[in-house]
């Protein structure tokens, strides 16, 4: 059984650092995305940090990482450190999202300046 979002992600996508435990549940990406969509920010961050500890590693697909950070920032919109972490992840995946990453950094800087 998938006891956490991290465990579910590990079953669906694998884990670069740990063996994927045996599991008799269905491993459909669409069902995982449904769970991810309604997960709380802390569960999503725990998954990202355990499965991709240095942002550029791990087996989570880029589309799942991007969606995960987007969902976290929707739940925690005023946290500059999370904005910068999301920006770093976007920069690490190539130039396609550099403009979005730069905007996240600008927003983080503005929040810091206002504090």
Question: Model regions: which residues?
Answer:
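N-terminal "cap/leader" segments of large eukaryotic alpha-helical scaffolds
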Residues: 2-21
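Alpha-helix initiation and capping sites
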Residues: 2-6, 25, 37-48, 53, ...
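Generic structural signal of hydrophobic/aromatic residues within well-ordered alpha-helices
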Residues: 5-9, 32, 44, 86, ...
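Alpha-solenoid HEAT/Armadillo-like helical repeat scaffolds in large eukaryotic proteins
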Residues: 11-16, 47-54, 85-93
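Charged, low-complexity interaction regions
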Residues: 17-22, 54-60, 73-76, 80, ...
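Structural detector for internal amphipathic alpha-helices that build alpha-solenoid repeat scaffolds
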Residues: 27-38, 61-75, 98-109
């Amino acid at each position: 059984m998938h006891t956490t979002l991290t465990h579910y992600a590990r079953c669906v996508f694998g884990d670069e650092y740990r063996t994927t435990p045996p599991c008799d549940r269905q491993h459909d990406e669409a069902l995982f995305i449904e769970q991810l969509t309604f997960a709380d920010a802390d569960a999503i961050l725990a998954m990202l940090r355990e499965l991709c500890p240095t942002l550029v590693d791990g087996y989570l697909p880029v589309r799942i990482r991007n969606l995960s950070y987007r969902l976290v920032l929707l739940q925690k919109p005023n946290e500059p450190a999370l904005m910068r972490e999301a920006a770093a992840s976007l920069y690490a995946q190539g130039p396609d999202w550099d403009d979005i990453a730069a905007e996240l950094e600008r927003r983080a800087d503005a929040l810091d300046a206002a504090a």
